[in-house]
Amino acid sequence: MDKRIYLCLAHMSGKEISFIQEAFDTNWVVPLGPNVNAFEQDLERFVGQDKKVVALSAGTAAVHLALLACGVGQGDEVIVQSFTFCASSHPVTYLGATPVFVDSEADTWNMDPVLLEQAIRDRIDKTGRKPKAIVPVALYGMPYKIDQIMSVADKYDIPVIEDAAEGFGSKFDGQVLGTFGKYGVLSFNGNKMITTSGGGALICPDEESKKEIMFYATQARESYPYYQHERIGYNYRMSNICAGIGRGQMTVVDEHIAHHKYLCGLYRELLADVEGITLHENPSGRYDSNYWLNTVLLDGNLHVRGEEDAYRETVKGAVGGAAGVTHESVSAHTSCEPNRNVEAMRVCLDKAGIESRPLWKPMHLQPVYAANPAYVNGVSEGLFKRGLCLPSGPYVTDEDVRYIVNEMKKSIL
């Protein structure tokens, strides 16, 4: 195949350019503006539940401001799902608080509600205080067990900040993720379900909460004719130009989600006869994943071409800044890494022009968080060692999926 197949490329509706041109024609090329207002309204209609939405510069900013709004500060603890991207936990540290990591359950791969309650009780016993917030994550679009998580959170009166950055449009019992907890985080990075180039949003419970988030996102400027600041704020508002992209994207969001789900069905069909490879799917009818990225697990006894050399050339393609990776590693190995057959399959697919990547490395296994409290059961570590993400975006065709699965089969010994 001549072209390279990527995990999830941004797909334009064609309407984005008119909204962007409108911003240029009216000279609204700064943060805030008509596109931002309209994009927020589009998002509010999409998520429903009478929620309010603030468009922001990134999903990370949304996590940060949600934590701030929940009163998180110096010396506090926040429970965060360990199996996630670092943007779920890093903002906790921005506020001088400590992330406390909770492992996953095997059904959804997300925060284990039983382990969550154990963690809360233990933190109360050890510190004499409750954690200030709970952050579950919709990994690769899969809904978390939000009914059980909310039950635990309500029992201890702890606010929930849903990290639905990867789960835009995913639902549990027909309700959109991000609308169950006190706040919901969305991401519109270039590889997400919809994009604003870079950007995110925070789903808020009401208009008053939205105004408070907007206040902190615009440098916490007070309402005087001159610049008065009584609290520390941040430069987190979305550009009117980026919001124009978002408005165009909202015209095709349903189409995007449907395509990702369709690809999951195609992967299911084509991988059905492949022993040793398991596709992750909704555990029951209550779950409705957007399948942002389709993911598979490789059995430990599945042998793949090139296993013996799996980690010899990894860093060569990772360094250079194209994905923001600028630090060159001395060794390709760490104390915890995907199994050799997973890395070997990634390399085989890469040589065939197919992008794939391992699952997120759990935060409790990251060196930067080595000293943090963690409540683990081995689930996320096991998934990390066995899992691989496959191309799933709007530009991935039926022919592409057939080619991908065929190359996967060819790599198996």
Language-model region placement:
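Conserved PLP-anchoring active-site segment centered on the Schiff-base-forming lysine
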Residues: 66-118, 318, 349
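Phosphate-binding glycine-rich loop
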Residues: 32-77, 91-93, 101-103, 126, ...
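PLP-dependent aminotransferase class I/II
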Residues: 34-41, 50-51, 114-118, 125-129, ...
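Hydrophobic/aromatic ligand-binding patch that stacks against planar heteroaromatic rings
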Residues: 90-92, 152, 241
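N-terminal "arm"/small-domain region of PLP-dependent enzymes with the aminotransferase-like
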Residues: 1-30, 391
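Active-site phosphate-binding strand-loop segment of PLP-dependent enzymes
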Residues: 107-196, 201-203, 208
